[in-house]
Amino acid sequence: MPGPCCNDVCECAAGGCKTGCVCTSCRCSPCDKCTSGCKCPSKEECAKTCSKPCECCP
């Protein structure tokens, strides 16, 4: 049986899947705007390049 986080929606934590979860399609919600500490020009780039997009983007 698949893990509890791999059903319909993966739980997001620290920019990716929750610890212990194995999900190939897990994605954090898009960020509206990157914070000053996050050197990314857009929400798309932030999600791709920032180490922890869920935390560095509000």
Swiss-Prot record:
Residues the entry annotates as binding a divalent metal cation 5: C34, C38, C56, C57
Keywords: Cadmium, Metal-binding, Metal-thiolate cluster
Induction record: By cadmium.
Residues noted as binding a divalent metal cation 2 in the record, renumbered to the chain: C6, C10, C23, C26
Residue numbers binding a divalent metal cation 3: C12, C17, C26, C28
Paired cysteines (S-S): none
Residue span of region Beta: 1-29
Domain of life: Eukaryota
Residues binding a divalent metal cation 4: C31, C34, C50, C54
UniProt GO MF annotations: metal ion binding
Sequence positions that bind a divalent metal cation 1: C5, C6, C17, C21
SUPFAM superfamilies named in the record: Metallothionein
Sequence segments annotated as region (Alpha): 30-58
Residues where a divalent metal cation 6 binds: C40, C46, C50, C57
Primary role: Metallothioneins have a high content of cysteine residues that bind various heavy metals. Class I MTS in crustacea are involved in the sequestration of elevated levels of heavy-metal ions.
Family (UniProt): Belongs to the metallothionein superfamily. Type 3 family.
Protein name stated in the entry: Metallothionein
